[in-house]
Amino acid sequence: MLSRREFVGAGLAAAIGAAARGRAADEGAPVRFLVAADIHYRPGVFPFDTDEQLRKIVARGVSEKVDFGIQLGDFQHDAKRGRAFIDLWNDAPFRTFNVIGNHDDDATTPAETRAALRLERGWYRFDVRGVRFVVLDTNYGFVNGAFVHYGKGCGFSPYKLGAADRLRLHPDEFPFLEEALGTATGPCVILSHRTLAGEDADAVRVRQIVAAANRARPGRVALALCGHNHCDRMVRRDGVSFLTVNSPNHVWIPFRHKGYPDEDVRRWREIDHVVAYDGTPLSAVVTVCADGHFAVRGLAGGFWRGIAPEQLSKKLTKRGIAPVIRDYEG
C-alpha cells in the first residue's frame, strides 16, 4: 500500500505528467495552490506575532510555484492595526485570495474588513484553468429575525448566540452556490471558514446542493476546505472530502494552565489559554487535476518549547492535538 508521500511522488506525478503532456500548459493542466488557516495575528496576545512565519508560508508557495494562495479566515483580529500584515499576504508574488473568519471582524466593521482583504463581498467564485473555486462566508448571525454579519457595531456577539443562530450563511449564498456549481464545466472546490461537514441546518443544505450537482455530473465537487477548528481532520461524506486545515500557531482551550514560563505569559497574554505550536509555517499545497482528483501535501511541526498538551493539563491527554497537516488524496 502506497504511503501518502509515495502517492504524491508516484501516482499523482503520473497523472500530472499525463495531463501536462496532453494539454497546453495554460489549459487543463493541474492547478496547484497554497492554503493556510487561522494564523490569528494579534501582537502581544498570541504567538507568533511577527511577520516571519507568514513570510515562510509565502516562501513555500513561491518554491512550489503555486498558481495562487488562499487563507481560510481568522487571519488577524484588527484589520486596521494589522493592515501591513494583511498586505504582506495580499501582495505576495502569486495571486492571493481571502476567506473571512469570525475573528477577522473583531475590531472592524464588515466593510472595513472586506476593504483590507480586498473583497467586494464575503462570498464569491473564481476559475483557474477550468477548476472552479467557490468561497462562502459563514459569519452571519440570525438576530431578531434577520441575518446580520458579525463585526464592530453589529449589535451582537456571535459567541453569545445559540448554536443554531451563529456562524450562519446568508440565505443568498445558497442560490449563489447552486449557480456556481451548476455552471461549472470542470471540477469544483468549496472554501469556507467553518466546516460544512456537520449536522447544522446550513451545512446540511450546502451538502444537498453539492449532492444535486454531483448527481447531474458525477465528480463535479470532490473537495471542500475549511479552517476554524484548529485541527487536521478529513471527513468524507457522499463522495466529497471535507478537509479542516490546521492552524500553524495554536489550539485554544477553555481554561487557563500554568505550563509555560512567566516570560511567555508576559510576552503573550493569552498563551496560558492555548496549546502553542513551535512556529513551523504549517500550510498545505493542494493539487487539483482536470478530472477532479486531488492531492494535499501538508507539513509537520512541534510544540512550543517542546511542551506537549498532556504536560500542560491532564485534561488534554486524549484531545489528539497535533501540530501537523497530513497528506491526503482523493
Predicted regions and their residues:
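Short, well-ordered beta-to-alpha junction loops that form the rim of enzyme active sites
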Residues: 138, 191-196, 228, 299-300
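N-terminal active-site segment of His-dependent metallophosphoesterases
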Residues: 24-84
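Extended active-site neighborhood of metal-dependent phosphoesterases/phosphodiesterases
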Residues: 25, 80-182, 205-222, 231-274, ...
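Acidic-and-aromatic substrate-binding clefts and catalytic sites of carbohydrate-active enzymes
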Residues: 43, 75-80, 105-106, 196-201
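A short C-terminal boundary segment appended to hydrolase-like catalytic domains
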Residues: 27, 266-330
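Short acidic, glycine-rich surface-loop motifs adjacent to enzyme active sites
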Residues: 181-198
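N-terminal secretory signal peptides and thylakoid transit peptides that target proteins
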Residues: 1-14
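Active-site glycine-centered loops adjacent to acidic/histidine catalytic or metal-binding residues
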Residues: 38, 73-74, 101-102, 193, ...
